[in-house]
Amino acid sequence: MNPMTNRRVAARLIAGCTVLAAATAAWSADVTMRISHQFPPAHHSAKNLEQFAADVKAATNGKVDVQIFGSAQLFKPNQNHSAVATGKIEAAAIVGFTLGGTIPEMNVTLIPYYVTSLDKMKKFPGSEAAKLLDAKLLDKGLLNLGWMVDASDGIFTSAKTALVKPADFKGVKIRGLSKLFDEGLIAMGASPSAMPGSEVYQALQTGVIDAGFTGVAAAYERKFYEVQKFGVASNIILAHDILVVNPAWFNGLPADIRQAIQTAAHKAEQRSIPKSADISAEDVKNLREKGMTVSVLTPAQEKAMAEAMQPAVLKAFQASSPDAQKLIDLVNKL
């Protein structure tokens, strides 16, 4: 190889290294979006978030690396709010009603048999009611990207006898959801203890509580059938998992990246809405196949439960915030 050829090869190598360095620099500038959540891998919301990550990757041509940390690996459920708001992590999926102590209005969908129709579920995201709540979340350092339905139903599980009518709850130590929802349980004579879904199985197993409450699908995913004999399902509440991000982090992203993430969040939101307001026959079947005796309340039985629970919960909600009645009026318009 002559000197001229050597110089040409060297020039090409230098040019190639320059391109590689530029590509490496560009890659190092890519966005990392870490999401913390409490759900086990089999949980439907965990699977929805995995699809969200895939959608973001596809939409951004791999420029955004969505890293998901489920099963409370990084933060406990009650730590996610602070972690996102202070920038310790970019994002989290939080069960909305768990923020009810900080933002009382987040409990509105826990009013028994109130926001559980399929029509209201479809209309809620993007509604004036949702916008009011989004504004309150932003005031607390959380930018909400989506309202993912966690459960549009609920199942009371028990070991000794099925909890079918209000009188069956008298004296029962039961998993509560929030101070607000628990007013309805207290009205029926139960003794609720609020706790995250991740803690319920052990509480049932050790006898800390007698009865559980969760979504029908979650009862299967969290293996309640191993520690409970009976399950009574109904369209009692609407629970959302909100996908929240740190506002400063999100607003600092390029516009196209923000749009891709928001679009993927909207898809996750839409995927989460059930096809029917009926209790999933598949979810009931799954529990029955594991040996649990499961029944679904009739409309008349739901009415009896609503009459026993709703007045106390509604009264507590109206007293919880100056904006409570405004929110109720907005939900009534859905």
What are these regions (language model features)?
Residues 2, 14-16, 29-120, 128-334:
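N-terminal secretory/targeting leader peptides
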Residues 6-11:
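N-terminal export leaders
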